[in-house]
Amino acid sequence: NPSNPIVHTFSEGNLRLTGTTTNWDSACSTIGASSGKWYFEMKFLALYGGLRRAAMGLVDARDQSLLMTNEYGYIVTGAVGDCVGYNGNGSSNNIKKNDNNVANGTQWSVNDIICMAADLDNGAVYFRVNDSAWLNSANPESGASKTGAVTITVGEDYVFGGTAYGNTTDWQFNYGAPS
C-alpha cells in the first residue's frame, strides 16, 4: 500500500518484494476485505545470512500503518485488532497470532511456495508449504468448524501482505486455491 511507509523495494508489477538488511518492515496490499474467502501465495527466493527472513499474513486494517515496522504475527503498541502470520523468523518457522505461537510450521527452503487461505466469513486462517497438507491438521474446506485454523475476529476489515528482511519474495500463483 503506497500510503504506508516502507523501506523495501517493489518490482515486477509489485509482485516482488526485496527487503533491506536492517529492518523487519512489512508491506500491506491495497486490497482490504471484511468477508469472503481469499487465497495467497508467496515464493521464498533467498536466505539472508543462512536464515529465513520472511513472513506472510493478515492484519486488522486499522493497524496496518503500525505494522509497517514489524512483521506479520506480532502485535505492535497501539494496535486494536488481530495480526496473524506465518513467519520464517531465523531458523524456525512458526504460525503466530498477536505475538503468540499458535503452531510450529514446516521449515521452508529457497523456492518453496508459502500458501495462505483466509475465510473471513468464519474467522479462520490456514497455512501450508507448497502443495502439501495444510499445517496444524487444518482444513480450509471445514467451514464454520475451523478445523486447525488460526481464529480471527469476524466482521473486521483486514489487509494482506508480507515481510522481508534482506531477501526477496515473489507473489504469483503456483497452486490453486482450496475448493
Please name every model-derived segment.
Residues N1-S179:
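PRY/SPRY (B30.2) beta-sandwich protein-interaction domains
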